[in-house]
Amino acid sequence: EIESSYALDRLVWQRSNISSTAKTLAYSDIIGFSTYVWNKNYNYTLAKEIKTLNPNATLVFGGPEIAIENKDIFQKYPFMDIVIKSEGEITFKNVLLALKNNKSLEDVPGLLINRKGQLVDTGRAVRINELDCIPSPYLSGVFDDLMKDTQGVEWNATLETNRGCPYGCTFCD
């Protein structure tokens, strides 16, 4: 159902000129940002530029660098529409299905939603216990065209043996 309703048009995996990248992405309906310490500032600048060009684009952020405990997150980052609080694979799929079927995002667990600067927290998503249920982007062909178009680039696969912080501190977990 996702594949027939949405197209994965572009993977931005290298830092390119912000303005040209924003112009390329701006007229997408939904844009996802996987945010880490090494791309956080680039992603935020790119997202601001995209929102300037297309205020109707839905910008979805996730990743370990998003400060989900910050209750003022949408005042600080008003360009964010949706933040996925934990593992994104199933939650992002549920976001896409809700948007496609005109269902309320408030029924999708695991989100922070920006409602005109006010935070709506949809609770916790169910944790993925069996990582084998998630298709590998390498084995499913998601990266095939990208790798073919970038001959000479050394690619590395990531082997995930666990996820998240192992400590389970009460302030975070």
Give the residues covered by each predicted segment.
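Glycine-rich beta-alpha loop elements in corrinoid/cobalamin-binding modules
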Residues: 2-130
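Radical SAM [4Fe-4S] cluster-binding motif and immediate context
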Residues: 132-173
